[in-house]
Amino acid sequence: MRAAAVQLNSNEDKERNLGIAERLVREAAADGAELVVLPEKFNVLGSSEQLAAGAEPLDGPTLRWAESLARELRLWLVAGSIVETVEQDEKLRNTSALIGPDGSIHAVYRKIHLFDVEVGEMVYRESDVEGPGDEIVVADAGELKLGLAVCYDLRFPELFRIMAVR
């Protein structure tokens, strides 16, 4: 399976970000990609307030856009991550979705390991606005087994060992 990683400099303008992402996904598909992976928070990136303003449920406009694009281009699409609202929880989630060529969501992963660190005088506390996921996700993407992870999850090798065993 030919795969492509799409990179873009997202900001708080969701419409702009989706336009750029769509152009890049289409370019990857034209180059033969059967699996395209979008980056973390590809649809909206900014301050905590901007993330909250751009957050949406799984059935919101960003994943509907991704489902439509995957269906049209007949490819697997990892919607890198979006900022997800969760019913009855004030905390947001950093959520990745695997969408199939049929345009349906085949797997959903919510980032488990939140980035709460102090680097010199800088303090990062994702847990102030985001809640952790609690499920390790490995899904079928055609003949490929695909483990989903987001950003800081990379620092926890046990997550990937578990995925490999599955």
Give a label for each model feature.
Residues 16-25, 156-162:
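Short, acidic/polar
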Residues 6, 55-56, 149-152:
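Glycine- and other small-residue-rich loops at beta-strand/loop junctions that grip anionic moieties
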Residues 8, 41, 154:
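Active-site metal-binding loops of divalent metal-dependent hydrolases
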Residues 16, 58-61, 130-131, 155:
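Short secondary-structure boundary/capping elements
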Residues 68, 87-166:
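Active-site catalytic loop in hydrolytic enzyme cores
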Residues 1-4:
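Extreme N-terminal starter segment of soluble prokaryotic enzymes
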Residues 14, 23-102, 106-110:
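Cys-nucleophile CN-hydrolase/nitrilase-fold catalytic domain and related Cys-dependent amidase chemistry
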Residues 7-14:
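Short polar catalytic/cofactor-binding loops
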